[in-house]
């Protein structure tokens, strides 16, 4: 049976460098373990993986200026053979009722009902923000629900589920990307706001809108 080398343990506790690093490690672990998960993050991650598989390029959690003095947050932006695709992910379950032009849709889980903003209308604003940057190329929108969601009256146009996502996407490969589409993609990416201040500002705006809805 091997003997424990207590000298190694003693060195670890007496080494000044170890005492300097230890608090940093503890803080990082604390932040990672206790940081609240953003609502819908798991669903967005699942959609992002599918998009990377079937699209030429994908950017996630994109923040752009909306052209009206504000900011807009896009779950996913993808480059396809037909142009740019703006994707809104909804990690909802239960029965979903809503039509294309309704202001709000309804989620039903058992006896509980909850109204939420029509995601097609919500994503339309995202599409317009991208079009403002690259008006010369086609920009389309798509809303993706998780497979836990059911649509008793059928999927509205422009809406799909995770398992049907591939069927809703245009066939795309590296050779099918037009140079103008690639240039438009690069232009939009160059307009993406990545600084923390912009992201914090968007969160404040989103919370105000939620309180006012």
Model-derived features: where do they sit?
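Surface-exposed interaction regions that form or flank ligand-binding interfaces
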Residues: 1-72, 79-84, 93, 104, ...
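Ligand/cofactor pocket segment of small-molecule handling proteins
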Residues: 90
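Polar interaction faces of repeat-based domains
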Residues: 96, 100
